[in-house]
Regions:
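Charged catalytic cores and adjacent phosphate/nucleic-acid-binding surfaces used
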Residues: 1-15, 19-37, 41, 53-59, ...
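Flexible loop residues that form catalytic
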Residues: 49, 118, 152
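Hydrophobic/aromatic-rich structural module bridging two neighboring secondary-structure elements via a short loop
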Residues: 69-75
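Aromatic-lined carbohydrate-recognition surfaces of secreted/lumenal glycan-active proteins
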Residues: 114-124
């Protein structure tokens, strides 16, 4: 309840979406149109691997078109200690450094840091002993802001209960995300929070007022997505061999116009 007795509005967010810019299978405009037409999400974050250009474009397009869902610029950063969701960033966060240094850089850039699909015994995932070491440090610059406690993929499902318990025991906000690499997966995991804006979501993470929701994918759906990814990799390889994709990634069709809105900036380049 709010102070005047009214029922607080609960917003929904999916903070882990991939586009054609990394290993997703849908373009930016496709994703935005799908979110608008087929979900009730208030906030989404585009979090391609180690780049933010598509996320910056998505935010610009959403604002230009007046779409319902607010777009957060994010990045799934490849660190030496596992994948990390960097949200509310305006410049690319450098990959392939320690998890602690990456979290500190995200905070210094004004963002928040959330380990993706954590605790899974796999090199792409932050391990519990590493996270405890960070949380034990006196400098909060090295502390993660939340944990991705719900990830509906085969990577997240077996360890879900353990991650929820870890977040609770260590005083971390819990968020649910889809880790979507295909349109149909968007919203399979989500976060509920008081309010409806990205600012409301950020405040809720800071005060641990978030709740994760979602349903796990079946094996057949995961296999279909993997097949789409393989087809996408094949197209990229063919285009690269033909010289249409340069080393910086430019030339790849990311599913949005070259200049969708005025606030696309040079720093969004990978």
């Amino acid at each position: 309840m709010t102070r005047d007795g009214a029922t607080a509005r609960i917003g929904t967010a999916d903070l882990h979406l991939h586009t054609l810019a990394s290993d997703g299978t849908a373009g930016v405009v496709e994703i935005l149109e799908h979110v608008e037409a087929n979900t009730a999400l208030d906030v989404v974050a585009i979090t391609d691997h180690d780049r933010i250009d598509a996320a910056v474009a998505a935010r610009a397009i959403a604002r230009d078109r007046g779409l319902r869902a607010e777009v957060i610029v994010g990045e799934e950063v490849s660190t030496l200690g596992g994948h990390l969701l960097a949200l509310f960033v305006e410049e690319r966060i450098r990959p392939l450094r320690t998890l602690s240094a990456t979290i500190a850089e995200v905070h210094d850039a004004g963002g928040i840091a959330i380990p993706a699909h954590p605790l899974v015994p796999y090199p792409l995932c932050a391990q519990g002993w590493v996270l405890r070491g960070l949380l034990d440090r006196s400098d909060e610059r090295f502390h993660p802001d939340a944990l991705e406690t719900f990830n509906p993929t085969m990577l997240g499902r077996p360890w879900h209960t353990r991650v929820v318990r870890f977040a609770d025991e260590n005083g971390l906000a819990a968020v649910g995300n889809s880790d979507a690499h295909a349109l149909g997966a968007i919203g399979a995991g989500w976060t509920e929070f008081p309010g409806r804006t990205a600012a409301d979501l950020r405040a809720a993470i800071a005060t641990r007022e978030t709740i994760f929701r979602g349903s796990f994918h079946g094996t057949s759906g995961q296999v279909r997505t993997f097949g789409r990814q393989l087809a996408k990799y094949g197209r990229d390889a063919k285009a690269g061999a033909a010289g249409r994709i340069r080393r910086d990634g430019s030339g790849r069709d990311l599913g949005y116009p070259p200049e969708p809105a005025a606030d696309l900036a040079d720093e969004a380049r990978p």
